[in-house]
């Protein structure tokens, strides 16, 4: 049986063997608080590659040490961190998948002992510290840090870069009027609030020629915040700069109630795709092969990002293929166990 979920997908100069992406998820497992890859990361990502995920995306990886969400996050702020990341891409590639990395800065949501930095001195909530409002020099240094991180990503062997512009972290903070109250060229109008991301993309393009994704929070879930229609305009600007795919998540820029249900964010991937003609990724409570297949067949997204379901079962692609009646080409080491997988779901 043919399956769109298991059909190849080419984006720029990279061909994925299927449309399943391991969504970036922080593992908080850099045990020495130095940003380094550990054996856990090698097994964690390598296993999903062996499980036949098409694109394995490494978790939010900090471009500056002070830009980590926690002390145990992965980092890419120094050349001495390349070796561990290169081992990770080798594990992924050797097991048949392409490798991506999400480049990130936590902004005001950095839970470290040092200062947090943000476009404006507004805390996320009353339990978190008041961040330092970034000056122009700090903004320029952060943009340069993203560029250097992109170059290190190339040296580490990654095929795809994703810029983390969602979930209330630094890029998202500049984009949203809820968190950006600046009166200089980086605040005020949508064009000015986009300027930080624009300059990051320009700087990354100088050193990286592979596919670039951007993860967005397509809805602030606040009456004064951004909606998916605002992100249509942002996406048009990103597309003009050469961005290849928009990974459509939502929320977390400010505390808000979100109604969560299966595929609750697919609507954003569909809307962005329809109104900008750019490739999109759908993410959020996508847990079965038939659900993923339907999203693709309905032309609501181009790639399917799987998160917690891959934590529950690193061999999700095999189960999805079984569900869809698709014969999956597995590692030769596993061919002694042919036939259907029986689950209790």
From Swiss-Prot:
The residues the record assigns to binding FMN are 23-26, 60, 102, 215, 307-308
In terms of InterPro entries, this protein maps to:
Aldolase_TIM, NADPH_DH_bac, OxRdtase_FMN_N, YqjM-like
Any one Pfam family here would be: Oxidored_FMN
Enumerate the catalysed reactions: A + NADPH + H(+) = AH2 + NADP(+)
Task: Specify the domain of life of the species encoding this protein.
Answer: Bacteria
Broad class of enzyme this protein falls into: oxidoreductase
Give EC number(s), comma-separated.
1.6.99.1
Q: Which CDD domains match?
A: OYE_YqiM_FMN
Query: What biological processes does GO assign it?
Result: response to toxic substance
Entry function: Catalyzes the reduction of the double bond of an array of alpha,beta-unsaturated aldehydes and ketones. It also reduces the nitro group of nitroester and nitroaromatic compounds. It could have a role in detoxification processes.
Q: How does it assemble?
A: Homotetramer.
Q: Which PANTHER family match?
A: NADPH DEHYDROGENASE C23G7.10C-RELATED
Designated name of the protein: NADPH dehydrogenase
């Amino acid at each position: 049986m043919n399956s769109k979920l298991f059909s190849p997908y080419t984006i720029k100069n990279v061909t994925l063997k299927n449309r399943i992406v391991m969504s970036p998820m922080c593992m908080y497992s850099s045990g020495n608080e130095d940003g380094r890859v550990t054996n856990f990361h090698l097994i964690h990502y390598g296993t999903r590659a062996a499980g036949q995920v098409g694109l394995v995306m490494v978790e939010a990886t900090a471009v500056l040490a002070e830009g980590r969400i926690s002390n145990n996050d992965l980092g890419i702020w120094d050349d001495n961190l390349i070796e561990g990341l290169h081992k990770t891409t080798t594990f992924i590639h050797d097991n048949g998948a392409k490798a991506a990395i999400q480049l990130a800065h936590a902004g005001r949501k950095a839970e470290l002992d040092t200062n947090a930095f943000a476009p404006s001195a507004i805390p996320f909530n009353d339990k978190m510290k008041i961040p330092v409002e970034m000056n122009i020099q700090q903004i320029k240094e952060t943009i340069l840090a993203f560029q250097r991180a992109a170059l290190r990503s190339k040296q580490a062997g990654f095929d795809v870069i994703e810029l983390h512009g969602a979930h209330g972290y630094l890029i998202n903070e500049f984009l949203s009027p809820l968190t950006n109250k600046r009166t200089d060229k980086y605040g005020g109008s949508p064009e000015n609030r986009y300027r930080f991301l624009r300059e990051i993309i320009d700087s990354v393009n100088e050193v990286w020629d592979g596919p670039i994704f951007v993860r967005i929070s397509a809805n602030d879930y606040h009456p004064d915040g951004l909606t998916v229609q605002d992100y249509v305009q942002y996406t048009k600007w990103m597309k003009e700069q050469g961005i290849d795919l928009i990974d459509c998540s939502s929320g977390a820029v400010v505390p808000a109630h979100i109604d969560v249900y299966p595929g609750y964010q697919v609507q954003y991937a569909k809307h962005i795709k329809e109104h900008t003609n750019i490739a999109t990724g759908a993410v959020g409570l996508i847990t079965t092969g038939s659900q993923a297949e339907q999203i693709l067949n309905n032309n609501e997204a181009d790639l399917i990002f799987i998160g917690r379901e891959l934590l529950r079962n690193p061999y999700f692609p095999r189960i999805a293929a079984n569900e869809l009646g698709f014969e999956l080409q597995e590692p030769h080491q596993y061919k002694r166990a042919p036939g259907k997988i029986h689950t209790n779901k």
